[in-house]
């Protein structure tokens, strides 16, 4: 935003507008990362609390939405360390993502969620950001804090693992 309102009210309003534009996507990403709506809610709340407390820094970033997604990924990693195993209830529906090529090819989305949970955290984040959120390799690398080459290799390994896990389920 080029014009910034002064005072706390202005900061709150700017943050609200930002959150309105990114909240659904953050929530979907959080759910796809952890496989549980309640954990996703907590993850998004933690992410937004950190983003708000560092709002000026977030605004100065080249891509504020990428900065906040990076917070989300970091928070989810902390959660994975605490809870190594998450379960996905059968029949759980994933909201339709912006780019649904991969999800639409899977008969039961719960199976996709189960397969995602079988991936190591970094590979899961890469697949979610690249294919389910539709981000480029460059955007994904920026969010994950790694090179595009790392994104490519993590994606390749993840797709091989997903293919194996999904074949085992059929």
Could you say what each language-model-derived stretch is?
Residues 23, 27, 48, 120, ...:
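C-terminal flanking helix
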Residues 2-9, 13-15, 106, 142-143, ...:
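C-terminal edge and immediately downstream basic/flexible tail or linker adjoining helix-turn-helix-like DNA-binding
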Residues 15-17, 111-120:
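Short amphipathic alpha-helical boundary/capping segments
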Residues 126-130:
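A short pre-motif secondary-structure segment
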Residues 6-17, 27-46, 55-62, 148, ...:
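Short, charged helix-capping/linker segments at alpha-helix termini
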